[in-house]
């Protein structure tokens, strides 16, 4: 009986001494929960503020904000073409840059006829390296470029492991995905700084959120573009330059053409026209955005999920996309 009493008294003493620690842990838990709840609420408020509220008011005057001419690289199809058309619908004159002269002329004529704006073309193969930038610089020297859209990029033929890529494809990723955006900014930014206004939009990718297996070089190149854009914004915001990192997830372009699965999810995988219409409405509002409401939801999930879960999901999706692409070419 004495032993039971002694145990009970010991238990009471231990419980009393632990009370303060339990209260401290409860406070830490409450603080963590409140912080996470506020973060989630703020994220969803940002989603509404960015993708829905601007659509209720009048469209921003991009010519007044930035200038009359816009330069769009990779502009003959996909997001680049749709973005150029959306800018033209707002009255901007468009300079289209791509490697296929015939396609450039067709797109330039369509834009000029449809939107009654001036268009110009520059034929340039960004995979050729540094020699193409002198002619581009000469062609743009007399233009007051207000908006630069760095869209040109190359993708894998389909998701695959790094050693399965050819050396030529790796150089294309370096020259087109990384060097092109860097050098195009170097060409147009001095004029923007001199005029104290301008906008630079660089199109990255949702694969830059976390390391993405089976797209290693591509996702790394897009992570470079994201960091490059964010750093430029810090450097040049005080000089009147708006720099936006645009981070789309899947859009229904030639890159996703082999996948029937992706094209069935239209609310997750918008057409280039729908995507560009939403993305342009974020210009001047958000420095870093996916450009489309459902992509922003995907981005939030990507930010919150642990890296191992992202990698697991990416492996499953990319294996499926590779299998589907190979079955189409067989």
Curated annotation (Swiss-Prot):
This is Inactive hydroxysteroid dehydrogenase-like protein 1. Residues 2-82 are annotated as: Required for mitochondria translocation. The modification N-acetylalanine is found at residue 2. One of its GO terms (cellular component) is intracellular membrane-bounded organelle. It comes from Homo sapiens. CDD domains: 17beta-HSD1_like_SDR_c. Interacts with STYXL1. The lineage of its organism: Eukaryota, Metazoa, Chordata, Craniata, Vertebrata. Keywords: Acetylation, Mitochondrion, NADP. Belongs to the short-chain dehydrogenases/reductases (SDR) family. 17-beta-HSD 3 subfamily. Highly expressed in testis and ovary. Also detected in thyroid, spinal cord, adrenal gland, heart, placenta, skeletal muscle, small intestine, colon, spleen, prostate and pancreas.
